[in-house]
C-alpha cells in the first residue's frame, strides 16, 4: 500500500472525528449571540447539530478535493467510516439522553416522541454523506457528475441523437461463449481511473480492467471477419492475439511477427487436444509442401498454379508504368511456366514437386535457362505449359534479361535453405489444417516480412486455398489471425476470403496500425470502404493518427446538446444580462477525444448497431488467462539478462510466472 493511499484511508476519518469533538458543546456559545429568547433558542438548537454537520461537511469537502486521484476509493472508505462513527455517536448520545428521561415520560406516551429533531437531522445528514461516500468507494471518480454538455433526445434532437451501445446490449451481441475475444464488458471512460493514463506496470491504473466479463464474437452475424486498428505499442498482441489464441476452439492460423505468441499459448492448446505446428525459419525440420493442394477437390491444376505465381510475385493494386507492368507480367508468366513444368510435364517425381525445385530450375544461367525453356516447349506433355513457355522461346535476349531479372528477384528468398524448407517440407500437409485439428503459428519476424513478403504470402495463400478449394467440406471454421498484415502487401486471396470465406469455413481477423496501412496495401481510399463493408466488427484502439481519429468521430455520428448562453451589454444607462438556451450539434466523440482515449479502451463498430465503447481484454490483467499462458520471451523471469525488468509488470518483477 502506497503512502498516499494510506493517508487517504486514515486522514479524512480522523479529521471528521476531530471536527465533531471540537465543536461539541458549542450550543451555549452560539446561544450567547442571540438578542432575544427566540434567537437564543434557535442558535442553541443549531449548536446541537453543529458537530455532526461540521464532520459531514469536512468529509464531503475531502471527497471533492480527492476527485481525480487514483486512490479516491480509499478516501471514500475513510469518509464512509467517519460518517458511520458520527451516526453511532449521535445515536448513543440521544439514547443516553432518552434513557435519562424515560422514567418521567407518561405511560401512555413513547419515549421516542421526545427524541431531539435537531440530532436526528444531523444523523440523517451524516447518513446521506455516508451513502455518497459508499458510492465513491465503489465507483471511484466515476461517482462524480461529468462535465459533458447535456444531451437531448426525442423530438427535440434536431441534430441527431447518436449514443453509445449499452453494455447490456453488447453482452447480447458479443456473448462469452464466442471464441474471438473483442474486449471486456465495462466502460473505461466511466471507470474510477478514467482520468489516469493506462500503464502496464501500474496496477492502480488498471481500474476494473481484468475483472469484468468478456465480450466475445461467435461468428453469428455478418461475414464473420474482424479488423483491428491499434497504434504502435497499442497492446495488439496482448489484447487480441494471445486472448483469442487461448479461447478459440477451432482451427487456427496465426501470423506472429514477434515470435512470442506461439511459446505462450502452445502448451495450453496442446492440452486442449490440438496439434500445434510452429513455422519458424530458425528452427529447421518443420515445413510443408506449398504445392501439395494443387488440383485437389475438383479444382484444375492450372488455376492453382497461377494462384501460387501471383503470391510469389504479389499483385499491385496501384497503377504502375507500362514498362514495369510488362516486365512484371512477363516474369509472372515465366514463373507460372516453370511451376507448371514441375507439376504438369510429368518428368518430376511427386515428392520433388516443390518450390525448391522451381527455384533450382529458375536459378540456372540465363543461356541454359533459355535452352531449358526450348526443351520444355518441345517435350512437355501439357498444352498449358507449352502455351506459357512459347512466349519466351524466340524472345530477344535483352527483353528476356529483364524478365529473367524480375523473376529471380521475386524468388530470391527461395535460395535460403531455411526459407525454402518452410514451403518445401513434408512434416505436415495442408489437409491437416482443413481437417480441423491443427493450429499453425507462422513465426516470421518483421525483418523477414519486410525483406521477403513473398514467403508469408505463399504460406498464408496455400493454407487459405487448401480450405477454400474444399468448397465448405471442412470440420468447423478456421480462424486466420494475422498481425501486421500490412507487411504482406496486396494479397488477392485475402480479398477472396473476405468476400466468400464464411461459406467455406474461413474467418479472418486482421490487425493494422492505422487506416493508412490498409490504404497503402490495398489501393487508396477505396480499400477502406471495401474492407469495412465486408467486416462484421471493426475495432479502434490506441489511435495516434488524426485522420483515423477524424474517421471515428464521423462514423460515431452527431448528437443534439443543450447549450446555455449568457449575453451581457453595458451602456450609458447601466448594464443588462440575458440568458438563453439553444440546441447545437456536437459529435458523439470529438477527434481530439479519440486521440486522448486510454490505450486500454476501444471503440467497436458493427453494422446496424450503435458504436460500442468498452475495455480491452489485456491478458496479463486477467487471472484466468495468466494461469494458462507460458513465458514471454521478451520478459523472461528468473536469472539472466532482462532489459525489460525496470518497466515490467509487477508479477514479472516478483519473479513469478504469469
Curated annotation (Swiss-Prot):
Span of the signal peptide: none
Membrane-protein topology: Multi-pass membrane protein
Superkingdom of the source species: Bacteria
Region (Disordered): 562-585, 637-658
Gene3D superfamilies: P-loop containing nucleotide triphosphate hydrolases
Major localisation: membrane
Chain segments annotated as transmembrane: 6-26, 46-66, 72-92, 118-138, 215-235, 275-295
Composition-biased stretches (Polar residues): 562-573
Pfam families, sorted: T4SS-DNA_transf
Record's keyword terms, sorted: Cell membrane, Conjugation, Membrane, Plasmid, Transmembrane, Transmembrane helix
A single GO cellular-component term on record: plasma membrane
Location of the protein in the cell: Cell membrane
Family: Belongs to the VirD4/TraG family.
Protein name per its UniProtKB record: Conjugal transfer protein TraG
Source organism of this protein record: Agrobacterium fabrum (strain C58 / ATCC 33970) (Agrobacterium tumefaciens (strain C58))
